[in-house]
Structure formats: structure tokens, C-alpha cells
């Protein structure tokens, strides 16, 4: 709702996603129709299940009972001093893409914060293998500013470093064109 949206274009369709499950359903339905997927959405690792007061949790003999409950009120009660939030793991959607379309060229992103370049590359390589991606664009948040955006393009046998958003866009376009040839 509050995200910056691109200008309308005849070759652009915008689908609004409210949660991880919406994304899963949209991707599963649509990914089969494409040759290249740029998976740039930062999908939350966890989603809220239920929130309750600490007293209710302490009184419970089985914490799993809270996993099947739902909060129905829109506002959180302010009567409890301490609230406990139960979360559940969401599916890793990028890891499902190749199941849905084994031939698709998959491009993903990895954003870490204040890590060494070697660690950033290592984590990006792990993502490349785990998700069967063709390319992972790795970023460190501390290396991103209004005038600079250091990014490392990590492929199976190649690393390329760029310094700006424009260089990222140009190299990404070059990679996509290469998939087509």
C-alpha cells in the first residue's frame, strides 16, 4: 500500500501482495510462464501466529495450544505488562521456484549488515546453491548510500563487483540478455 509503485506501462502488471501466502500463491501460478525471475522481495522468515499475555503462557501446561489460536481484536490489549508473540516459520519461496519451473533463470538478492566481503560472498554462494539460482546479487547495508551501492554479482564460476545503482541495473540487464542468447 505504501510502497513506491512504477508508472503504468502496457508491458507491466502490478500484483499487490499482502503476506507470504499471497506471494506463494501468485508465484506458483505465474512462475511457469517466464524465462527469467528476479526475486527481489525480502520475504519475512517468520509470520505472527498469536499474541497473549505472559500470565496466560505461564499458566499453560502445553505451549502448542497457542499455535492454533488467533487474535480477533484489531488492537492489542494494554492490560498485560508483558506480551508474548508466537511466530511460525514461513516457506522459503525462492527455494521453490525451480520446482515450479526448472528451466527458469533465477536471480536472487542477499542483503547482510556490516560483514566482511568474504562472508557476504560465502553466504551468497550458499544461497546460489541452495536455491539453484543463476545469480545472487549480494549487498551489505553499510555499503549503500545515496551516491554508492556496492554490490557483488555472484555466479557459479564468476564474481563481479559494481559500485552504483546504475551499474547494478546495467550489469543485470547484460546478464538477462545473455540468458536469451
Predicted regions and their residues:
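A cross-family phosphate/adenosyl-ligand binding-site feature
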Residues: 1-111, 115-181
Amino acid at each position: 500500500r505504501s510502497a513506491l509503485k512504477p508508472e503504468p506501462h502496457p508491458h507491466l502488471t502490478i500484483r499487490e501482495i499482502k503476506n507470504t501466502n499471497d506471494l506463494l500463491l501468485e508465484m506458483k501460478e505465474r512462475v511457469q510462464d517466464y524465462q527469467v525471475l528476479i526475486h527481489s522481495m525480502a520475504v519475512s522468515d517468520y509470520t505472527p501466529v498469536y499474541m497473549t499475555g505472559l500470565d496466560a503462557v505461564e499458566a499453560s501446561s502445553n505451549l502448542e495450544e497457542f499455535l492454533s489460536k488467533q487474535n480477533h481484536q484489531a488492537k492489542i490489549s494494554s492490560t498485560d505488562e508483558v506480551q508474548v508473540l508466537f511466530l511460525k516459520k514461513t516457506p522459503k519461496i525462492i527455494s521453490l521456484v525451480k520446482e515450479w519451473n526448472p528451466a527458469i533463470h533465477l536471480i536472487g538478492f542477499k542483503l547482510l549488515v556490516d560483514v566482511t566481503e568474504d562472508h557476504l560472498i560465502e553466504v551468497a554462494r550458499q544461497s546460489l546453491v541452495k536455491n539453484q539460482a543463476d545469480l545472487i546479487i549480494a549487498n551489505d547495508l553499510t555499503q549503500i548510500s545515496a551516491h554508492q551501492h556496492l554490490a557483488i554479482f555472484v555466479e557459479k564460476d564468476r564474481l563481479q563487483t559494481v559500485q552504483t545503482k546504475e551499474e547494478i541495473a546495467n550489469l543485470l540487464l547484460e546478464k538477462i540478455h545473455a540468458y536469451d542468447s
